[in-house]
Amino acid sequence: MEIAVVEALEKFYGKSDREIRLFYSPGRVNLIGEHTDYNGGYVFPCALDFGTYAAIRKRDDKKVFMASLNFDLKVEVDLDSIFYDKEHDWANYPKGVLKILQEEGYEFSGFEIVFGGNIPVGAGLSSSASIEMVTAVAVNEVFNLNIDRINLVKLCQRAENTFVGVNCGIMDQFAVGMGKKGHAILLKSDTLEYSYVPLNLEGYKILITNTNKKRGLLDSKYNERRSECEKALTYLKKALPVKNLSEVTVERFEEYKDLIPDEVLRKRARHVITENKRVLDAVKALNDNDIVKFGKLMIESHNSLRNDFEVTGKELDTLVEEALKLKGVVGSRMTGAGFGGCTVSIVKEDAVEEFIEVVTRNYTQKIGYAPTVYVTGVGEGAGEVEYLRR
């Protein structure tokens, strides 16, 4: 894929003696800690070993040419006039990054950029954050903007929030921008305090299973859940001096939950508060080398997302149910925003083939179409890639 984007840039925009540089940004999966990030809580993502490549070449004018090996659409943008255009589809993500960089006072000329990746779009594995981050890192490096990585992460989140209009938390951009091979990231969403936790998965594999249900984050119930959490917090604030739901302990919630008059809002808050504790318990389990305990917490997380947060649906539930029937599966849960997308499972290496065969067969029988299973590793965060021409 990396050489393909370099060759495509020359094919689409011609050869020249100007240097073509190559950058990469991974996808991510959140192992546990779902719908906690916009509630100020803990999340536990890791970068994956697949992602988005971008080949970039400077120009002298203010024109930016964008193309992708994954989509037919090619886009031309004038740096003096960047605005959201629904017709530009995927290109609005990198365009948003350029707009935010300009708003922050950074100057750069035009360029040609060609993207290509192997992250399934709409699966909840952060294809959007990956394309944002690879754009930000590429422009930062090529034009010597000297922006530190955490600020690049924040810029990319702002691009998705304000330019594209998706009210996402910061986890996706943080995971793809700050990922570290062989480690997951324990991230506190409101303060951005973080630490790397070694993922000692000897004898186990991470399997990501895509429901292949069509969905879009923009038109899902994501923003509705966010607003429900904010309403629940308003009630709890009457008795508790807290800034967000994640500051409420499970014990305090049990004591004060009746302040929330609406049962639905109470369930939403209960998920966030218990999920936050599950993340910390999961990190402890990993540090204790207790992969079985980690798996149990993943299952509890899924049950809470199904029963209290109500964001799973029959496709995700079927994948988890079928996975948990197999002996070699220690844990499985939905990951991402929900309503489709993917599950993440921890599976013994010698059970991977059985998982793929049995889960695919049973899901297809129950749902009517097949899922896609990815066996993945934990990869590096975004950065420049050396390449050799063919």
From Swiss-Prot:
Catalyzes the transfer of the gamma-phosphate of ATP to D-galactose to form alpha-D-galactose-1-phosphate (Gal-1-P). Mg(2+) binds at S128, E160. Keywords: ATP-binding, Carbohydrate metabolism, Cytoplasm, Galactose metabolism, Kinase, Magnesium, Metal-binding, Nucleotide-binding, Transferase. GO terms for molecular function: ATP binding; galactokinase activity; magnesium ion binding. The record marks R28 as: Transition state stabilizer. Transmembrane segments: none annotated. It comes from the Bacteria. It is found in: Cytoplasm. It comes from Caldanaerobacter subterraneus subsp. tengcongensis (strain DSM 15242 / JCM 11007 / NBRC 100824 / MB4) (Thermoanaerobacter tengcongensis). It is an enzyme of class 2 (transferase). Coiled coil: none annotated. ATP binds at S68, G122, A123, G124, L125, S126, S127, S128. Substrate binds at E34, H35, T36, D37, Y222. Its EC number is 2.7.1.6. This is Galactokinase. Belongs to the GHMP kinase family. GalK subfamily. The active site is at D172 (proton acceptor).
